[in-house]
A protein has these predicted regions:
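P-loop NTP-binding core
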Residues: 1-263
């Protein structure tokens, strides 16, 4: 839940990597972050009307675009910063919980706002994988994502605030399950990202993360590399820019282990 932990880059890399490994799989990304960095990376930013904000406010089908690398995307909006005032809700817990189910309702809508010309109707039925990029701060946007999701992946950068934030995210996940907002929600695991194994602080924080959440850490990590930073600067995924860099290799290994992708 901390900005800069590599969550957006991880969503981009996982989605692009899955399509690269198996072109028959259909992958959708949804941008809930008001910063709209994911939308920028996939070239669907600045859609003033056809975005997730308007879909959630109107509680209608979501607009789906097809990007150049074969991934599909639902654009975000800077207005997501203020969406809480437009969601249903009230003082009671039951009324509050109603505001957490808006995204799920949009995704279940059989009148998907298809911008691809492919006849899309229902997001859940039309895609094999759906990735939701959440905002850095815990908010109703986060709850909406967790209520709609089947699994949660927590990217963890080897920085003190990122490691500390893991417990907060796990607490929110437990709350969603405790109040039966999504009984099927599962933790996919913690994914160490932007790892520089040469530094002392990385070794110290890796040890701390292992002591606190050792059984939750995935058996893979994503190393930091210059090629990855260059790819981001060029608005490309690591698989488009440098698939055989250390970061590209790490993401491919992570994808195969997490999703059991058949090539």
């Amino acid at each position: 839940n901390k900005g800069g932990v590599g969550k957006t880059a991880t969503v981009q890399s996982l989605a692009s990597g899955i399509v690269r490994l198996n072109h028959n799989l259909r992958v959708l990304v949804i941008d809930l972050d008001p910063q709209c960095n994911l939308s920028s990376l996939f070239g669907v930013r600045d859609n003033e009307y056809d975005n997730i904000y308007n879909a959630m406010c109107k509680q209608s089908g979501v607009p789906v675009y097809k990007c150049k690398n074969g991934v599909y995307a639902v654009p975000g909006s800077a207005q997501m910063e203020n969406i809480e005032q437009h969601l249903p809700g009230g003082p009671s817990l039951r009324e509050q919980m109603k505001s957490y189910t808006v995204l799920l309702g949009c995704l279940q809508d059989n009148d998907c706002h298809d911008m691809t010309g492919e006849g899309l109707k229902n997001v859940f039925d039309d895609f094999d994988y759906i990735f939701i990029d959440c905002p850095p701060a815990l908010s109703k946007n986060t709850y909406n994502a967790l209520v709609a999701a089947s699994k949660i992946l927590i990217p963890v950068q080897m920085e003190a605030l990122s490691v500390k934030g893991v417990s907060e995210v796990l607490s929110v996940m437990d709350e969603v399950k405790e109040f039966h907002m999504n009984d099927n929600l599962e933790l996919l695991g913690l994914l160490p990202v932007m790892v520089d194994e040469r530094t002392k602080i990385t070794k110290q924080l890796s040890k701390l993360l292992g002591e606190k959440h050792g059984d939750l850490i995935l058996p893979c990590r994503i190393r930091r590399s210059v090629k990855f930073l260059e790819a981001q600067a060029h608005g490309q995924s690591i698989f488009e820019y440098a698939p055989y860099s250390s970061t590209g290799i790490d993401y491919e290994i992570a994808i195969k282990r997490m999703f059991n992708i058949k090539i």
